[in-house]
Each structure stands twice: as structure tokens, then as C-alpha cells.
Amino acid sequence: EGNTGPEGHAYSRPPQVEGEATNRAIMIADMAGVPLYVVHVSCEDSHEAIRRARQQGKRVWGEPLIQHLTLDESEYFHPDWDHAARRVMSPPFRNKQHQASLWAGLQSGSLSCVATDHCAFTTEQKRFGLGNFAKIPNGTGGLEDRMPMLWTHGVGTGRLTPNEFVAVTSTNIA
């Protein structure tokens, strides 16, 4: 369709593909008899695959990123190309409907912790992808913002209790 900007990154990585990849990884781990830790859970499809596997007694854990809990795909359509490119990461941000599932997973325990995948690039480095989103280096910052963002958007809004906050940032990881 001629999408060459940061929005093309999101279009090229739909949530259904993430969900299918999660299902496949769960199946392979189960066949091999090994546990599975799914990183960067960004969508309902992936979370639901993890939730079902855990209900079946499989040793599967899932980890959303703070970015996927608080930002959405509208970031890629920002009129400032630099702003949009600074948010290119994989998987990409999804529409807001997926966030409700991720928060529910943290509340119920089907998703076990929150991470950042901190991998920052300068604006100059991100500009390598001008005219071709596939050349935008994947990664965003987030390490310094994870705890206050999770407290504000989790505990501060009633999505998480203080005990759930401690669990998804410390206890479950240990």
C-alpha cells in the first residue's frame, strides 16, 4: 500500500501473527517438555494463548512491556516523523483494545511480570529509516520509567493493587 513511514512497522506485524507465534511456541515447548517464558506480550491473542496454556497446567509465563500497557498504535501516526520513529519497537504498539487484556492478565496472574526491553536509539539513528520503515532501528527506552508508569497507570487507576504491583515488578520475577 506504499506505507513507508513508522506506521508501516505496525501494519507489517499484526496481532494475529503474534498470537499464532505464541500458540506455536507453546505447542513446541509442551512437546519438548520444557517451560516457556514469552517476552513482549503485546496483544490479546498472545495473552489468551498463554492463559489457556496455564489453565491446562503448562509451564508458560508471559511478560508484557510497560510500553504496551500505556501506549497505543496512534503513536506511529504522529505528524512528527521523529516522534513516531522513536516509538518503533517489536512487537509494535497495538490499539487500545489489547491493553485491557494485558491489564486483566496482570490482575489474574496469567501474565507474571512487567518489563521494558530497554533498547534506546538516538533520533539520528532512527532516521536511518527515513523512506523505509524496515530500516528504522527497533527499540525504545523505558527502564527509568517502568516503575513510576506502572504505579501511575496500574495502582493509580485501580487496575492493580499495591500487592499486585509488587508481584509483577519483584516477587514473581524472583
Residue ranges and their predicted role:
Residues 1-114, 130:
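Histidine/acidic residue-rich metal-binding segments in metalloenzymes
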Residues 7-33, 112-114, 120-174:
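His/Asp/Glu-enriched, well-ordered alpha-helical/loop segment
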